[in-house]
Amino acid sequence: DGITHETALNYSVGFRGPNGRDLISSFADYVLENDLGGEHYSDPDLTCREHPGRVEEYELERLRGMMIDMIRQPEDFKQWFGSFVTTPRHELDIAPAEPAYEEEEVVDALLGGEKLSRLSGLRVLHIGDSFFVHSEQLDTTDAEALDALCRYTSLGQEELGSGLQNPAFVSELTRLINQGYWYFEE
């Protein structure tokens, strides 16, 4: 994220989207980390054949199908993708809050007109009904307030709305601030 205060040129050096190898590798890591895909290949109709070293086309298709079925699991795929795409590709300048904020302090500051800024480079996404920050899926009950975290780089009471009355959201927001992902503007 770059911010300029006057006309400027912008150059991108070396940052590009993932390739197929990156995607497959990352998804395979996710499958292993979450102990998914534990079903074994089986072919109950297999009989002795004349050429024991030959693999039939239908056998390859069944194996390919097993692999593709892993990717077709919508919740697992969404969880992997949200984590993958919000993982930073470069080191962020994260400075956890010192001292840590209490939930009441966060609410009072925001209701008092203070604004939060998102850490530059932090990846925050809304995918379906899920929200991801820095490769982590958020668990909360206030979709509108979480959507505001994804939508705005600077936000306050107006953007967060009724989320500031939701204890689960306030707890989540306070944790994110204390981790250094958002900070109060000076």
Residue locations for each model-derived region?
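Exposed alpha-helical structural elements
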Residues: 23-26, 62, 144-145, 168, ...
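Short acidic, hydrophobic short linear motifs in intrinsically disordered regions
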Residues: 144-165
